[in-house]
């Protein structure tokens, strides 16, 4: 077990490259964040409508800047670093040559371009797939596969591609010189067998759906195993001591789940990030929807089932930009962040927002109808922007409750505990609304940096500082604040959820389709 004297403890350098920032943290074996540096990044740029790209070298420069600043400030702790670990945003894809040099901009997970499915999916097969209600799922997967688009639109780039990597794989090569990645990062439109945690077999239909040659894919290892060692070149650029082992972890969402202490399906893990998600960890392969598999966890031989709201707590940023000028001005004056002031904005708004109901489908999620749209109903003369903001939070959490109920039906395991992480969990109002809508206590971890912490847990197990994941989680995670539900508010929310929210999409769905047919939006 780890020693008690903090000066003699091993320290883990955890790098967390998210959508809006890159963090580097020094974390001890008790799960304490000893020091952290956060560098905001530009999530993407868009040269065409619907595109969302970023230069891979920009990501690397921001990573080097972040680790460099951290280790300059904490030079005295360098000798205590026992290992390095890495977690990144999901499904951001990069084409590289034999030297690991990017051949084109990264296509981020926010990108909405579509490949031509007609060039891949035979017309004769469409009626069959439609009969078994899988046509939309298969067609969407083909269209959303970044590799398919590149093959069709930039065949010269695809021909030059040596490896097609996640951002995590790109960083791993820059750090270690190896084309290798963690199974826990393998999320996206790739020929991967989620049941076996390996690339698909030779005759698997996924090779037909996703036009990727196997030799262009990296080697894969399990979370907590060693990816490689920091090279001398990487050391010069990042400030990380050469020779340190780099341990496989998982995606940023996956590491959030682990860092929140979720290891079994009885615990529901809510992530209040750009994407809002409801996940459970399970040893069993369970598809919540046909042909949409659970994804590999940050723990070996485990799956995460996930329901996501694509525009999750991004909605808070949307509200800030469109309706939050007053809070933005006040926050700048007081050197604060506007989001904190929104809690005060709604303190006098009653639970249920006097019937103002929001369904947060600003962008359709996985498995949703392509023409799905967000909606707000129930306006009256009492409603103002404060009511709108509370309705926004309530709508997001109604959506997560719906996801939680689907999860429990499919896993056949009741959720008895809620853990909430992500930037939005810093909102006291959002946490209380969560407890009230779900009707059970909502726990916030001891740190908001659960993604970096989850990656550090992988490294701690890999370093043999703990014998297994349960013991590492017991020692490195703990509950911060617990929000208990109000019975009165829960009864109100339960009625609004069952009698209104769950009926909204079905009632409005035909109108959403008409809107798309008339306006052509979304394409």
Go through each PLM region and give its residues.
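A polyampholytic, Gly/Pro-enriched intrinsically disordered region
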Residues: 58-59, 123-139, 266-269, 461-475
């Amino acid at each position: 077990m780890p020693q008690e004297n903090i000066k003699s403890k091993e320290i883990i350098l955890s790098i967390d490259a998210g959508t809006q920032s890159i963090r580097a943290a020094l974390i001890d074996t008790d799960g304490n964040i000893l020091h952290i540096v956060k560098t905001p990044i530009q999530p993407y740029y868009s040269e065409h409508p619907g595109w969302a790209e970023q230069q891979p070298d920009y990501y690397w420069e921001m990573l080097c800047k972040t680790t460099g600043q951290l280790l300059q400030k904490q030079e005295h702790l360098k000798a205590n670093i026992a290992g390095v670990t890495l977690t990144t945003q999901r499904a951001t894809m990069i084409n590289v040559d034999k030297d690991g040099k990017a051949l084109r901009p990264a296509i981020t997970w926010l990108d909405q371009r579509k490949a031509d499915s007609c060039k891949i999916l035979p017309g004769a097969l469409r009626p069959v797939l439609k009969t078994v209600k899988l046509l939309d799922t298969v067609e969407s997967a083909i269209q959303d596969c970044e590799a398919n688009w590149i093959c069709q639109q930039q065949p010269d780039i695809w021909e030059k591609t040596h490896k097609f990597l996640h951002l995590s794989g790109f960083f791993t090569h820059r750090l270690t010189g190896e084309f290798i990645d963690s199974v826990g990062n393998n999320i996206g439109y790739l020929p991967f067998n989620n049941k076996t945690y390996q690339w698909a077999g030779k005759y698997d239909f996924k090779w037909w759906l996703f036009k990727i040659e196997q030799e262009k894919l990296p080697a894969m290892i399990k979370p907590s195993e060693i990816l490689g060692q920091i090279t001398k070149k990487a050391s010069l650029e990042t400030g990380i001591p050469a020779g340190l082992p780099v341990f496989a972890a998982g995606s940023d969402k996956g590491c959030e789940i682990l860092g929140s202490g979720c290891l079994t399906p009885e615990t529901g893990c809510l992530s209040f990030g750009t994407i809002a998600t409801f996940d459970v960890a399970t040893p069993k392969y369970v598809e919540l929807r046909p042909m949409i598999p659970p994804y590999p966890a940050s723990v070996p031989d485990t799956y995460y089932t996930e329901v996501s709201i694509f525009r999750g707590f991004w909605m808070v940023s949307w509200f800030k930009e469109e309706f939050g000028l007053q809070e933005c001005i006040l926050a700048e004056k007081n050197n604060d962040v506007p989001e904190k002031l929104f809690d005060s904005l709604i303190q006098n708004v009653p639970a249920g927002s006097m019937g103002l109901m929001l369904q947060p489908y600003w962008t359709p999620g996985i498995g949703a109808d392509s023409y799905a749209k967000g909606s707000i109903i129930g306006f009256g003369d009492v409603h103002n922007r404060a009511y709108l903001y509370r309705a926004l939070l309530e709508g997001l959490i109604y959506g997560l409750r719906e996801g939680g109920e689907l999860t429990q039906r499919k896993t056949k395991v009741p959720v008895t505990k809620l853990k909430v992480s992500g930037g939005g969990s810093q909102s006291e109002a959002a946490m209380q609304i969560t407890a009230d809508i779900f009707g059970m206590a909502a726990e916030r971890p001891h740190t908001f940096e659960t993604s970096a912490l989850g990656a550090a847990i992988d490294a701690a197990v890999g370093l043999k500082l703990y014998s297994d994941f349960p013991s590492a989680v017991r020692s490195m995670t703990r509950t911060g604040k617990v929000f208990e539900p109000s019975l009165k508010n829960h009864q109100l929310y339960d009625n609004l959820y069952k009698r209104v929210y769950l009926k909204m999409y079905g009632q409005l769905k035909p109108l959403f389709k008409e809107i798309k047919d008339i306006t052509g939006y979304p394409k």
